[in-house]
Amino acid sequence: MININNINPEKPVLIVGPTASGKTSLAIAIAQAQGRVVVNADALQVYDGWRVLTARPTPEEEDAVPHHLYGHVPFTAHYDVGQWLQDLTPFLAQNPVIVGGTGLYFRALTQGLADIPAIPPDIRAEADARSHTQRLADLHEGDPALVARIDCDNPMRVQRGWEVLRATGRPLSAWQDETPPPLLPLGNTTPLALMPDRDWLNARIAQRFDQMLNEGALDEARANLPRWSSAGGAAKAIGAPELIAHLHGTLPLAAARDAAVTATRQYAKRQRSWQRSNTQAWQSVPLP
């Protein structure tokens, strides 16, 4: 693992890793040892209503050290990386531990983010109404350079590219090519990339989802049911569609559990793929 005594207390710490790899516990350990705050860099943990299902820190963990940008976005709102950078900025002076599994957030933080106009609600609704396959086909035609850059299996990345192309008439790849300097260059941080063994991680994913069910994930989904149809990014929480399907009576709980575990493992696979391509300059932390 990591010897915390070797971490420079004068630099922000970045921790990236696939879901269920132990990022939260490491972040808290570093924050406790060095008197830091923990700041979220997970695009799903920003939403209220999903504490259990998105594996946000527990109330006890939040009491142990200050935590920020967890559950601060309304369930029905849309939230993007530009808003996250704005929300993060006030905490940078505190040399925080920035932790999460959203590679786009870390790339924007350390490499810069293009100043793209906001997406109008009608364009977003149009994007939501199209299938992933349709959006990807449009991108192949309108922004092939972006298709070569992104994980095309990630619906959020594909939809973002589609929305920018539709709203601005200009490819997202062209906007990205004009990216300004980063808010926090990687060289000014201690960047840690957790690299878990696949079989070890897959077992943890199954165990953790069962633990989530025991700790009330289904009750959490039931509480969110009345606003599910108007959910923004919160609807993309891994395991949420499966639990909602069970509550609608279209999927037995055992099948919902298995489907959610499979979806989580697929998500972790995409995260590991992103890390292999984007964290060569980070300190690799093999696990277990």
UniProtKB/Swiss-Prot annotation:
GO terms for biological process: tRNA modification. SUPFAM superfamilies: P-loop containing nucleoside triphosphate hydrolases. Its EC number is 2.5.1.75. GO terms for molecular function: ATP binding; tRNA dimethylallyltransferase activity. Transmembrane segments: none annotated. ATP binds at G17, P18, T19, A20, S21, G22, K23, T24. Belongs to the IPP transferase family. HAMAP family: IPP_trans (MF_00185). Monomer. This is tRNA dimethylallyltransferase.
